[in-house]
A protein has these predicted regions:
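Transmembrane-lumen/periplasm boundary regions of multi-pass, lipid-linked membrane glycan transferases
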Residues: 11-167, 173-198
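Internal/C-terminal transmembrane anchor helices
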Residues: 207-215, 221-242
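Redox- and metal-dependent alpha/beta enzyme cores, enriched for Fe-S-associated oxidoreductases
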Residues: 196-199, 240-242
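Alpha-helical transmembrane segments
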Residues: 105, 162, 187-188, 208-220
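Alpha-helical transmembrane segments of polytopic membrane proteins
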Residues: 199-209
Length: 242
């Protein structure tokens, strides 16, 4: 009901699509009886309906035209920000938004897709359907905003957590990977903000390369094995950047 108040009909449409597709794949329509729809629907209307009725009372058909026409139909068919209307916009958002956990999220998504259709894996199936429904729905819309993908953060994080034990041990050094990733990302952000263009892109490339080597060194050997080389590489990057 709150989603409908803030986003309009789409606030019920996409969650309803997720539930429908999940029940369709599970072939357990009897679950609808356990959703207490006879109680839920009146509560939904009690929360959402008064505002819509009041707005219609104040503005008449203009409210319907603006709500459905401008904020739903036009956004779906006409891009408000044409520069964002590219195929790689949402993939880039996903990769950046989950830093420094992107690798674990991608691993969880991959394992979840593989397990989604197993008979005894309803939770991964539900989470994958949840993510896919929102992602595909908003990818097909002409207007693209980073905030449109917010509903997939929660199921993506759950998948990453569920399949974390299946991540190879050499990639599970959280005490090293997390601070190191944050460190190198912070350096790249700082280079982008404070180093003059186009030199900043060169510095970002150096920091990115150094960060990748740093993490790969840690994953291949015990703590401190390649520390001297990493320190020298870091100092070199600082000298070049300065």
């Amino acid at each position: 009901a709150l989603a409908v108040l803030s986003k309009g009909p789409v606030g019920a449409l996409v969650p309803g699509l997720v539930i429908f597709l999940f029940l369709l794949t599970q072939k357990k329509w009897a679950e609808l009886l356990h959703m207490r729809l006879l109680i839920g629907i009146p509560i939904f209307l009690l929360i959402a309906a008064p505002w819509f009725l009041y707005m219609y009372h104040l503005h008449g058909k203009d409210f319907v035209i603006v709500l459905l026409g401008v904020h739903n139909f036009l956004r779906a068919t006409q891009p408000e920000h044409p520069e964002n209307n590219v195929f790689y916009f949402y993939p880039a958002i996903v990769l950046v938004a989950f830093l420094p956990w992107t690798g674990f999220v991608l691993h969880g998504l991959w394992k979840g897709i593989l397990d989604a259709w197993k008979e005894k894996a309803p939770i991964p199936r539900f989470l994958i359907i949840w993510i896919a429904s929102y992602y595909l729905f908003y990818s097909l819309m002409a207007t693209k905003y980073p905030t449109y993908l917010f509903p997939i953060w929660f199921p993506s994080a759950l998948l990453a957590a569920i399949y974390l034990p299946w991540v190879p041990k050499k990639f599970r050094f959280f005490e090293y990977i997390l601070p190191i990733s944050i460190w190198w990302v912070a350096l790249m952000v700082g280079a982008y903000l404070f180093v003059p263009k186009p030199l900043s892109w060169f510095v970002i490339g150096l920091f990115l390369t150094a960060g990748i080597f740093h993490l790969s060194f840690i994953s291949k050997g015990p703590k401190g094995r390649f520390l001297p080389g990493v320190v020298l590489l870091t100092i070199s990057c600082y000298l070049i950047a300065s």
